[in-house]
Amino acid sequence: MTTLASSYDPSSFESRLYAQWEAAGYFVPSGKGEPYTVLLPPPNVTGTLHMGHAFQQTLMDALVRYHRMRGYDTLWQVGTDHAGIATEMVVSRNLALEGKGQTRDSLGREGFIAKVWEWKAESGDTIERQMRRLGTSSDWSRSTFTMDPQPSAAVNEAFVRWYEQGLIYRGQRLVNWDPVLKTAISDLEVENVEEDGFLWSIRYPLADDVSYEHVEHDADGNETLRETRDYLVVATTRPETMLGDTAVMLHPEDARYLTLHNARIVLPLTGRHVPVITDDYVDRAFGTGVVKVTPAHDFNDYQVGVRHDLPLINLFTVTATINENAPERYRGLDRYDARKLVLSELEDLGVLVETKPHKLQVPRGDRTGQVIEPYLTDQWFVKMDALAKRGLELVESGQIKFVPPNWINTYRHWMENIQDWCISRQLWWGHRIPAWFDDAGKCYVGHDEAEVRAKHGLGAEIALHQDSDVLETWFSSQLWPFSTLGWPDAQAMAERGFGRYLPSSVLVTGFDIIFFWVARMIMATDSFTGQVPFRDVYITGLIRDAQGQKMSKSKGNVLDPLDIIDGISIEDLVAKRTSGLMKPKDAPKIEKATRKEFPDGIIAHGADALRFTIAALATHGRDIKFDLGRAEGYKNFCNKLWNATRFVLMNSEGARFTGVPQPRTEAEKWILARLDKVTAETHAHYANYRFDLLAQSLYEFAWNAFCDWFVELAKPALNHQDADAAASTRHTLLFVLESLLRLLHPLTPFVTEELWQQVAPRLGITTATISLQSFPQPGDVDTGSYASAEADVEWLKSMVSALRRVRSELNVPPSKQVRLLLQAGTADDRPRVARFASQLSFLLKLESIDWLDAGQDTPPSAAAIVGELTLLVPLEGLVDMDAERTRLDKEIRRVEGEIGKCNGKLGSATFVQNAPAAVVEQERARLNDWTTQLTGLREQRAKI
């Protein structure tokens, strides 16, 4: 007797099953078979699971489970990133909330780092617990934290090697500087936001009594102004930085200023003389064609400064106040207070020409929201030219494949325009740079201080202090493919399978970190191991909300995947979306929108429904609009699968089968042939990373072919007196269902395991879990001789669909029996009707089936056409005749529309000449079928 619950309730078994899988060690690499390795992009240890994580991890897990079932030695390497800046912010915030008066600075470096480790021990595994709830089948025993001893040793080794090879150097460059965090940050941590600002035009006087003839023209080329000027007009959005100007720049071919090449100007407010230089960088059509150059505070100006050997004047302190390089009256002012004073003094001097509104792209730190400064500071850098050249070769030679392939263009663009990489950060939490300085400022690099002293003969009397900076997190993340496999320690490499699991099989990640992480892993892995880090890179789109908006806390449109899985009340959802906002004033707007979209909160969908939704939405190369309605639909899909399994189990009580079914009915042969086709499609879709087509194929087979059709077609055989047909039908039901559960398992692991545990024993299967059962293969069943059965059942389906449509349109109650009259048809139709009479009668509630002779008068009837066969349901006692006339008119219009579509295609020379011959022929056959149907419908309409 089946013990399967009467209703689908994922909360009753999902967590239980995961605990069983993990305890049994099913996710640990077997060490047997061909290796298949997937790298998890390590999420921040501070983070919680968001929809982007859930999206990518679902696809990774499907790939891992699929290959595990195919006998591969699967390793899914997981772990977390120490997330330097984010972690320091979280711990600093927690210290403030504790109310003990402790701060980062009051604790000091060692005390603060100790607090970070305390926090990590208490809260650092949150995201891994959430990943388990999603169903990720990763080897948790190998979970790695980037600050663990092994990865930390890899970081030191990589730094020392690159330094000794001349690839790492210390120098003064412009970096993105966050004045709140007081550290350099990466480009990825900068958000460019369009904001309203101003463009100020300022007169810069020419030095040395130089003047020139200034001429202006209107749009038609007519001269509107001619005068002698002893100044140039410069436009800027940041007037405070003029205190650090070291040149004014013109285009060398700008006819307006040809006489001013090599002139000088007197910088207002400072009195400094700076040169007028020429450079092709200048856009002559923008503004006056004159540009101020501030090399220490603008990335483009810095490049100009390098080309022209200009001095660099840094105006700011680490907190973006004015330093000693500016005139004394500005020193100590905040940058925006300095701006006000500069503008006031320019106006007093009469050199502020114009102020007008201007749209700005303002760089803001993604964590603090502060305006980021291009800041001149001493940092550590990696020389990228040679590394990037090799990294590009590895991709263009095909050793690494991008999916979809168009992302190679993005990769190439970045690699061909690469700059040296700033790897140092002014933080405490992270991998401290393995460099020491003596009192004279000389630098020594080594794995530790003892090695440095021994290598350079430095006695204890020579004081050394370690660089206080840490490496940015991308430096350790670039080593992830091989540091997790024990590199550089030979014993650890042997124990963790370095030689077996590198390169990994595929990296699943987003396009936004192709450069920041993917490219750097390619370069570093090649540099340190001589191998590629992975064979394939599958680039996903970004998850957006149903309206296509980016999900963000500030917009209040974030969906927590665990809320979709387990459900959340509207009050809790509102509280989650409105707490911790950077702009608390947005809370009422967010609450209103949330209550409108989710008046009753979010119901529990279960992990499988979310996972199947993600797969179905995973189209190539597009951002994903996540619609919660799709998840509801796929929860219904899981429920339908549950109910179909209950039907099969209840109709196979006491039955035990082994081997492949020997089908006795056409319906069995049809479903087995369909199973073979969907199995082949499944393998092809996995090979091409087409998870959307995979979900579509499996959904179509499970819902339509198996649940809607085969289960219904099986009922007559199960209730028939032919015991052999009933037995083979039971065997086929169980066999196809068990195969379907295996096909679905990588996408929906929980419900398939729960159902499979009930189904498998009836087929003599003793494997402990579906996750280790072999994946179905095309050819598991020899369906080569089933073509005629397939055609017969497709005909039967057409008959049933046509008659059901008639019954529905006539509003005939499901239980009421009707007569069926048949007329015309092909030579195959009569024997088919005879063979399928019991199925037709059972499925359509037919009182009788009778044939009419050609030309025989027919009673007023509702008509349908299947091929050349006319199906008639006498209307007497069934329907209002006026309603039937309306129905026929509607059906005639529908068929006429289909004929119009066919004629449109066949009337197009482009279609007929360019489409495959088989497609054109298929369209002609469709036109013939529709024309036959229209003739029959018109004849029937004429009779009533």
Curated annotation (Swiss-Prot):
<dbReference type="GO" id="GO:0005524">
    <property type="term" value="F:ATP binding"/>
</dbReference>
<keyword id="KW-0030">Aminoacyl-tRNA synthetase</keyword>
<dbReference type="InterPro" id="IPR014729">
    <property type="entry name" value="Rossmann-like_a/b/a_fold"/>
</dbReference>
<dbReference type="Pfam" id="PF00133">
    <property type="entry name" value="tRNA-synt_1"/>
</dbReference>
<comment type="similarity">
    <text>Belongs to the class-I aminoacyl-tRNA synthetase family. ValS type 1 subfamily.</text>
</comment>
<dbReference type="InterPro" id="IPR001412">
    <property type="entry name" value="aa-tRNA-synth_I_CS"/>
</dbReference>
<dbReference type="InterPro" id="IPR009008">
    <property type="entry name" value="Val/Leu/Ile-tRNA-synth_edit"/>
</dbReference>
<comment type="subunit">
    <text>Monomer.</text>
</comment>
<comment type="function">
    <text>Catalyzes the attachment of valine to tRNA(Val). As ValRS can inadvertently accommodate and process structurally similar amino acids such as threonine, to avoid such errors, it has a 'posttransfer' editing activity that hydrolyzes mischarged Thr-tRNA(Val) in a tRNA-dependent manner.</text>
</comment>
<feature type="short sequence motif" description="'KMSKS' region">
    <location>
        <begin position="550"/>
        <end position="554"/>
    </location>
</feature>
<keyword id="KW-0436">Ligase</keyword>
<dbReference type="GO" id="GO:0004832">
    <property type="term" value="F:valine-tRNA ligase activity"/>
</dbReference>
<keyword id="KW-0963">Cytoplasm</keyword>
<keyword id="KW-0648">Protein biosynthesis</keyword>
<dbReference type="InterPro" id="IPR037118">
    <property type="entry name" value="Val-tRNA_synth_C_sf"/>
</dbReference>
<protein>
    <recommendedName>
        <fullName>Valine--tRNA ligase</fullName>
        <ecNumber>6.1.1.9</ecNumber>
    </recommendedName>
</protein>
<dbReference type="InterPro" id="IPR010978">
    <property type="entry name" value="tRNA-bd_arm"/>
</dbReference>
<keyword id="KW-0067">ATP-binding</keyword>
<dbReference type="Pfam" id="PF08264">
    <property type="entry name" value="Anticodon_1"/>
</dbReference>
<dbReference type="GO" id="GO:0006438">
    <property type="term" value="P:valyl-tRNA aminoacylation"/>
</dbReference>
<dbReference type="Pfam" id="PF10458">
    <property type="entry name" value="Val_tRNA-synt_C"/>
</dbReference>
<dbReference type="GO" id="GO:0005829">
    <property type="term" value="C:cytosol"/>
</dbReference>
<keyword id="KW-0175">Coiled coil</keyword>
<dbReference type="InterPro" id="IPR033705">
    <property type="entry name" value="Anticodon_Ia_Val"/>
</dbReference>
<feature type="coiled-coil region">
    <location>
        <begin position="878"/>
        <end position="942"/>
    </location>
</feature>
<feature type="binding site">
    <location>
        <position position="553"/>
    </location>
    <ligand>
        <name>ATP</name>
    </ligand>
</feature>
<dbReference type="InterPro" id="IPR009080">
    <property type="entry name" value="tRNAsynth_Ia_anticodon-bd"/>
</dbReference>
<feature type="short sequence motif" description="'HIGH' region">
    <location>
        <begin position="43"/>
        <end position="53"/>
    </location>
</feature>
<dbReference type="InterPro" id="IPR002300">
    <property type="entry name" value="aa-tRNA-synth_Ia"/>
</dbReference>
<dbReference type="InterPro" id="IPR002303">
    <property type="entry name" value="Valyl-tRNA_ligase"/>
</dbReference>
<dbReference type="InterPro" id="IPR019499">
    <property type="entry name" value="Val-tRNA_synth_tRNA-bd"/>
</dbReference>
<dbReference type="InterPro" id="IPR013155">
    <property type="entry name" value="M/V/L/I-tRNA-synth_anticd-bd"/>
</dbReference>
<dbReference type="GO" id="GO:0002161">
    <property type="term" value="F:aminoacyl-tRNA deacylase activity"/>
</dbReference>
<keyword id="KW-0547">Nucleotide-binding</keyword>
